[in-house]
Amino acid sequence: MSQHYQHDVLVIGSGAAGLSLALTLPEHLRIAVLSKGELSQGSTYWAQGGVAAVLDDTDTVESHVEDTLVAGGGLCREDAVRFTVEHSREAIQWLIEQGVPFTRDEQHNHEEGSFEYHLTREGGHSHRRIIHAADATGAAIFNTLLAQARRRPNIELLSQRVAVDLITERKLGLPSKRCLGAYVLNRESGEVDTFRARFSVLASGGASKVYLYTSNPDGNSGDGIAMAWRAGCRVGNLEFNQFHPTCLYHPQAKSFLITEALRGEGALLRLPNGERFMPRFDPRGELAPRDIVARAIDHEMKRLGIDCVYLDISHKPAEFIKAHFPTVYERCLDFGIDITQQPIPVVPAAHYTCGGVLVDQHGHTDVPGLYAIGETTFTGLHGANRMASNSLLECFVYARSAAADMLQRLPGTPVPESLPSWDASQVTDSDEDVIIAHNWDELRRFMWDYVGIVRTNKRLQRAQHRVRLLLSEIDEFYSNYKVSRDLIELRNLALVAELIIRSAMQRRESRGLHYTLDYPDLLPEARDTILVPPIYGD
């Protein structure tokens, strides 16, 4: 039997954004936090870098704002950048109060400033402003926030729950369009439960799984973006997908990034015949910026029809390699690759979704009662290219802002009345899951080949034709068979793929992370790509 649940706030996603919002709300509110798999399966846990914030006396808000605007290729919304940076210090202070074990500065009286925690500097930042917990910041933050949430009796943490779709007044045939909750698959019972809430929050991460190679966990299938679109929310700048240049290429090695520090220490990129190729693309060779290296690798893979290229540091002494890169050395050894003697097979991998659901500074979407926070959103902070360590900051700042806004609106927002149960009377168990597996593989392959790092009009047109055929097949399957996690994710991923393709076709220039051979130059005016759903408006 399916279940009915009632909460004040329903949070779809258990990462940095979702947990922060739940913990910021007062303890008298009943809150549900849903995770598709185990609670730790989101992107937050795997984030290695840190959180960018203005913390040291030598740094300024203006400097952080300017660095972000430059990285964003003219498309950042300055009000969103300023709002995020101005609230960065208090967000970090809140994390410290929660107990996050950030790395302290052993030389606290160092000349550069007076902040007691160690700050690093990353690409694009003009100051040391990245607060971190060694090289596993995401895990430290996630474990701390999860432990705090488990201490709160008002926060219900529910794993193995996959949101199928949002429930809105419009979908129930009512005149307005408020969000009332969601239908959620319980993977343990196989039933679709009904969750009703005064406010619903999409905090479900990005959509990098739309590509064949990704550095993200399996769950990043664009669920929040797809559900918001179907509910009537606009989306923006989905053509901007960030790619990391070197992910380990091995059938068993899911999502393992090979740090850029290897190239910093002299590692060379080679073709299968051993030839170096980076000097042909940039005088800095392997030390060129991330997007240039990713494009060069992509070009060579397409030109030669090869599956990967090779990163070679074997010309360095073995002891040097083991001392400087113990994690990479051990992990590659697990897969039978001794990096002291042989090159590492690598491919670029989809890393971050810069666009998403349109929201304001409080996380409001176009649908009343529905908020969105984190990588699911398009706030205007990242523009055409995300700067390192701004993404976690965005999660905390917007989660806290959304929570404050909810508190103001709660007195005038009643709990929705009883909602209809999920209707599974017209569907049967699938005996053709091979269709899901085939469509899944086809989608991720053509998105990688045609809508990846380098694009052309013809590639985008081919991709659009194929994705529309897939959407038709998936909709038919969805109408006839019981839902599963794979089917829900495939349905969402195909929709987001179509939105990415449509966004890319509208941008007739090369800007930031969107690079097309047919329009290699910048247009004089920078404009966002905003897509409007069929049911947008009243």
Swiss-Prot record:
Query: Which residues make up the binding site for FAD?
Result: 14-17, 36, 43-50, 223, 375, 391-392
Q: What is its main location?
A: cytoplasm
Q: What is its EC number?
A: 1.4.3.16
What is the reaction catalyzed?
Answer: L-aspartate + O2 = iminosuccinate + H2O2
Q: Has keyword tRNA-binding?
A: no
- GO terms of molecular function: L-aspartate oxidase activity; nucleotide binding
Q: What's the record's note on cofactor binding?
A: Binds 1 FAD per subunit.
Which pathway does this polypeptide act in? Cofactor biosynthesis; NAD(+) biosynthesis; iminoaspartate from L-aspartate (oxidase route): step 1/1
Catalytic residues?
R290
GO terms (BP aspect): 'de novo' NAD biosynthetic process from L-aspartate
Q: Which of the seven top EC classes does this enzyme belong to?
A: oxidoreductase
Instruction: Return the SUPFAM superfamilies for the record.
Output: FAD/NAD(P)-binding domain, Succinate dehydrogenase/fumarate reductase flavoprotein C-terminal domain, Succinate dehydrogenase/fumarate reductase flavoprotein, catalytic domain
Which cofactor does the UniProt annotation name? FAD
InterPro entries reported for this sequence: FAD-dep_OxRdtase_2_FAD-bd (IPR003953), FAD/NAD-bd_sf (IPR036188), Fum_R/Succ_DH_flav-like_C_sf (IPR037099), Fum_Rdtase/Succ_DH_flav-like_C (IPR015939), NadB (IPR005288), Succ_DH/fumarate_Rdtase_cat_sf (IPR027477)
Query: Which Gene3D superfamilies does this one have?
Result: FAD/NAD(P)-binding domain (3.50.50.60), Fumarate reductase/succinate dehydrogenase flavoprotein-like, C-terminal domain (1.20.58.100), Succinate dehydrogenase/fumarate reductase flavoprotein, catalytic domain (3.90.700.10)
Could you tell me where this protein is found in the cell?
A: Cytoplasm
Q: Which UniProt keywords apply?
A: Cytoplasm, FAD, Flavoprotein, Nucleotide-binding, Oxidoreductase, Pyridine nucleotide biosynthesis
Q: Which PANTHER family match?
A: L-ASPARTATE OXIDASE, L-ASPARTATE OXIDASE, CHLOROPLASTIC
Q: Which NCBIfam families does the protein's record reference? A: nadB, PRK09077.1
Query: What family name appears in the similarity comment?
Result: Belongs to the FAD-dependent oxidoreductase 2 family. NadB subfamily.
Quote the protein name from its UniProt record.
Answer: L-aspartate oxidase
Species this protein is from? Pseudomonas aeruginosa (strain ATCC 15692 / DSM 22644 / CIP 104116 / JCM 14847 / LMG 12228 / 1C / PRS 101 / PAO1)
Give the encoding gene's name.
nadB
